[in-house]
Amino acid sequence: MSHAKKLSFLTVLVMMLGLVSPMLHAQAKLSIDKVYSAYLRNSGTISAQGQIKGYFFLYQSDKIDKHTNEYTLQILDENLNKVRNIKFEDSKKLSLLESAFNGSSISFLFKNADNKTLDMKIYDLDGKLKYTYSREYDKKTDDLMKQYETLHTDEGMNKNVFDMGEEGFVSVLPMRDGKQRTYEVDYYSSQTKKQWTYVPTDDAEKYAFAEYLGCTDSLIILEVLKKNHAMSGNPTSHLVGINVVTKKKQFDLDYSDDNQKLLPSYVAPLEGTPNVLIIGPYYDKDDKIGKDFSKGLAVYEMTTTGKVVNKVYNTWSGDFGKYLATNRKGKIDEVGYLYIHKVIRTPDHKLFVVGEGYKRQANAAGIAFTTLMAMGGHVNNSFGVTKIVVTDMVMMEFNDKYKVTGATIYDKTNNTAEASTMSDYNSQHVIANYLKMIGAFDYEFTTGEADNSRFAVCYSDYERSHEYHGQTFNAIQYNGSKFTTDKIQLKSKASTLRVFPAKAGSVMIMEYFKKDKRLDFRLEKLG
């Protein structure tokens, strides 16, 4: 897009959202009636340079006949004023899998059970349907999609459709090819009518599971776990880069030649350089990631060709042990293991890493049930003798050399995320990915200034005290020199509730009242 076109679009965007218009005034609340069905994953924020400019919501607004529904795409500005109201009719068997916003367009990935197609629809911000991309799916792929729909609850965040700046969107979906389970990457342009699909053809392994990590202007970066057997065998972790221009794999790294191997968890472009930053737990070369425990947290700098130019290792027992009580298995006292949610780089070159704890505990109910089943000569395949508990938030600070210089634990209420037999046998990494997939972590989002000079890390919690008993929304706020905490009590009779980032110092709360068929929105000040 040319500089002139960018200026023109931003001018229209600002005028459309009422950011310079005196006719639109800030309001604290908004209600929308006749909402027959609302899914929280069908909603999102509209932002520019890291600042909230509005919101979008897609919901079922009417029933036309026994085969057809009416759907509404509602666009609001940052003060909850209605900006656009787009209605369309489509199949009753239309289900929205994911949605995303990329700065200039909103994308929706639908599964149409009538036509047996996956449909990507891309709208601009004046409500015009720019492009529709469709492709058929078969029964084998549909079985995987049904598992996906079951696992992704309304409380879950976007998992499989991601923005690539103003150029377009990318989706990463499971696929079955005969007995082989693999994945496919679909790219959808929002600038021109262009779409392409990448399916790995050179993987010898029968099972490959891909997770999107991030992107650059020219790369889609994935973590891919590969193995030869569904129920056994040690998976190997690969960092895979797909070139957007050539539509081919640019690199596939498994670090097998190193003394340590990285399990990539987070990828972000390194500002001011063409390189990317990769962060994740690391293991000794001969460790099995499906069974063994990580040795610490590694930070790699990598070029877009896949060449690693810098490696820094921080051990759990040594480096992190100066600030947190950890053991050699990477387990923090009372917190457990860490999942990395966000990496924040500030103007003074500090690096803050947001983690959340999870751990395995004995499951009294599962033990009792297993004992009763065994006494009756039966095998328990439902309840685990252990359970997975999500614990506290952890804020870690690193210097410009990527060495840890501090870490603080922020207490929150432990909650049971998983109590089936899968918690008994799977590794810490597999469990962490599963918790992320089902939306079990309490981390919500990070918001702040465009340059990260000030930011707030937000998460949900549940308080049980004499003064208050119920859900809370919490913020760990950084003002450029120190951290403070804040929280909002979320008493509600709504069927479902979700908190969104909002303009500076506020959050936006959306509630769906299923019985009344009503969506309520309100802005609340932090503090």
Regions found by a protein language model. Name each.
Residues 27-527:
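Secretory-pathway ectodomains
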Residues 1-31, 527:
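Bacterial Sec-dependent N-terminal signal peptides
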